[in-house]
Amino acid sequence: MYGIEYTTVLTFLISVILLNYVLKSLTRIMDFIIYRFLLIIVILSPLLDAQNYGINLPITGSMDTPYTNSTREEVFLTSTLCLYYPTEAATEINDNSWKDTLSQLFLTKGWPTGSIYFKDYTDIASFSVDPQLYCDYNLVLMKYDATLQLDMSELADLLLNEWLCNPMDITLYYYQQTDEANKWISMGSSCTIKVCPLNTQTLGIGCLTTDTNTFEEVATAEKLVITDVVDGVNHKLKVTTDTCTIRNCKKLGPRENVAVIQVGGSDVLDITADPTTAPQTERMMRVNWKKWWQVFYTIVDYVNQIVQAMSKRSRSLNSAAFYYRV
């Protein structure tokens, strides 16, 4: 009996000794692996190009302000500025390096040369068909033309506001505008719009629904049309659909990353009289025009004051986003 107890105690002691040996061996192996791994990291760290993911950014303050990355020299937080101008400006200046000159001048106002983009357009009508405003801040220069006041006003209304639009099937349905913010916007190479208001029996008011020649014509061969009719009244429409598309749109509010600058003209365009414009102020301004160099110098000089009246938080705009924005 005593022999069995001694054997049991001896077996237990041997097991404890073996377990202790195994644990010490594992500890030495793990220490070797960890120290070797740390040694490799220490050796390779000077050779690695680390990236700081905003550790040194302040908690408060404007995120539009450029901060320098602690491990890189370039500016990684910056705003982009697009300047849209008519092609006649470049023709008059007639200098292949004029954009580089302006970029250097913008640099004196705190705008890096890589953040300024120059985009030309042929005329107001063609620009209105396919506006592309992709920068954080967009300045649109429109030279005043007394014969194009309506086109300039409609383009400004389109650019300075956000719109929610849906397609219209004018061959199958009647349409009505629900309130002042509800407009029909047409774009294309040639848009002719005719309307026929209907009474509660769907009979034409002053027109025949079966004869489009009796419809009232509200636009003729235009590239951009913002149609406003009597609210709450159904209308049958006739549109040159082969050269024009029409959408049922709702004005949502200001597009704050766009400013329209009228170049020259004794009359200043004003779209704030529209009751759907709220607040009754818009990012529209006028600069005197003698030569285009003078215009661009003025823009550079006042660019920061102009941008202060804007916000880069608005959505970008092109013709597709304008039609299908959700």
From Swiss-Prot:
Disulphides: C82-C135, C165-C249, C191-C244, C196-C207
Modification after translation: N-glycosylated.
Residue ranges, annotated region (CNP motif): 165-167
Glycosylation sites: N69
Chain spans, region GPR motif: 253-255
Entry GO MF terms: metal ion binding
Swiss-Prot/TrEMBL keywords: Calcium, Capsid protein, Disulfide bond, Glycoprotein, Host endoplasmic reticulum, Host-virus interaction, Metal-binding, Outer capsid protein, Signal, T=13 icosahedral capsid protein, Virion
This protein's name: Outer capsid glycoprotein VP7
